[in-house]
C-alpha cells in the first residue's frame, strides 16, 4: 500500500499519478493522463476518489472538473490507431503513459503508475508501479478519471461521424451490438486493424 511512510521515505513532495484507458477497445486511441499534486493535497483533496470505471458518467465529469481545478497540472498522452497497429497494444499503452508524463509542466519527485509495467523514462524520473493503483491511490484515481472523460468525449465525437456503431454507448468496445454493426458495415478507418474481430473482418473482404 502507498502509505504516508512510503512517500516520506522517497522524500516526495510533488507526486504524479498516471493511468490509461482504452486498451481493450476496438476503436480509437489509447489515452493516458498524468495528474500532478503536492503530496499532502493528494490525501486531503482526492481521498474520496475511486477508479473511473466505478463512477457514473455524471459523477465522473464532476470529479474531472474538480481535479482539473485543484491539481497543480494535468496532461494527456495519446497513441492513435495507426501507432497501435504498428506497435502492439502493450507498447502503445506504455507510450501513452510516457507521453502523458513528458507533457507535464514539471518533473515530479515521484511518479505513481497504475499497473505492473512502466515505460522507459528519463533517469531523473523516479517512479513506482502499483497493481490496481487506480482503486488504491487517490492521485492515480484522479488520472484515471481525466483519461476516461477525455477518451469518452473523443468517442462521442466519433459517434457523430459514424452513428451506426453506437460509439456513444460502447466507446468502441466489443459489445454484441458493435460486433453486429461491424459485420453489417465493416470497419471504419478508426478501427484497430490488428485486433481480432476487425482483423477477421478484413480477412473476409
UniProtKB/Swiss-Prot annotation:
Manganese or magnesium. Binds 1 divalent metal ion per monomer in the absence of substrate. May bind a second metal ion after substrate binding. It comes from the Bacteria. Keywords: Cytoplasm, Endonuclease, Hydrolase, Manganese, Metal-binding, Nuclease. A divalent metal cation binds at residues 19-20, 114. The keyword NADP does not apply. Residues 13-205 form the RNase H type-2 domain. One of its GO terms (cellular component) is ribonuclease H2 complex. Its cofactor is Mn(2+); Mg(2+). Its EC number is 3.1.26.4. One of its GO terms (biological process) is DNA replication, removal of RNA primer. GO terms for molecular function: manganese ion binding; RNA binding; RNA-DNA hybrid ribonuclease activity. Pfam families: RNase_HII (PF01351). InterPro entries: RNase_HII (IPR022898), RNase_HII/HIII (IPR001352), RNase_HII/HIII_dom (IPR024567), RNaseH-like_sf (IPR012337), RNaseH_sf (IPR036397). It catalyses: Endonucleolytic cleavage to 5'-phosphomonoester. It is found in: Cytoplasm. Belongs to the RNase HII family. PANTHER family: RIBONUCLEASE H2 SUBUNIT A, RIBONUCLEASE HII. NCBIfam families: PRK00015.1-3 (NF000595). Endonuclease that specifically degrades the RNA of RNA-DNA hybrids. This is Ribonuclease HII. It comes from Blochmanniella floridana. The lineage of its organism: Bacteria, Pseudomonadati, Pseudomonadota, Gammaproteobacteria, Enterobacterales.
Amino acid at each position: 500500500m502507498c502509505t504516508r511512510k512510503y512517500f516520506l521515505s522517497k522524500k516526495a513532495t510533488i507526486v504524479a499519478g498516471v493511468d490509461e484507458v482504452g486498451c481493450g477497445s476496438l476503436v480509437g486511441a489509447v489515452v493516458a493522463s498524468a495528474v500532478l499534486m503536492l503530496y499532502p493535497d493528494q490525501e486531503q483533496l482526492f481521498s474520496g476518489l475511486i477508479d473511473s470505471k466505478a463512477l457514473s458518467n455524471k459523477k465522473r465529469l464532476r470529479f474531472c472538473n474538480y481535479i482539473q481545478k485543484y491539481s497543480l497540472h494535468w496532461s494527456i498522452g495519446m497513441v492513435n490507431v495507426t501507432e497501435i497497429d504498428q506497435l502492439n497494444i502493450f507498447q502503445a499503452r506504455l507510450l501513452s503513459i510516457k507521453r502523458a508524463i513528458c507533457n507535464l509542466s514539471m518533473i515530479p519527485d515521484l511518479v505513481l503508475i497504475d499497473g505492473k509495467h512502466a515505460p522507459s523514462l528519463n533517469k531523473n524520473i523516479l517512479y513506482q508501479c502499483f497493481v490496481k493503483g487506480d482503486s488504491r491511490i487517490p492521485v492515480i484515481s484522479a488520472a484515471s478519471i481525466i483519461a476516461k472523460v477525455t477518451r469518452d468525449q473523443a468517442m462521442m465525437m466519433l459517434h457523430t461521424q459514424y452513428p451506426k456503431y453506437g460509439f456513444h454507448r460502447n466507446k468502441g468496445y466489443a459489445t454484441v451490438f458493435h460486433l453486429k454493426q461491424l459485420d453489417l458495415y465493416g470497419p471504419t478507418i478508426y478501427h484497430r486493424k490488428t485486433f481480432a474481430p476487425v482483423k477477421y473482418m478484413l480477412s473476409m473482404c
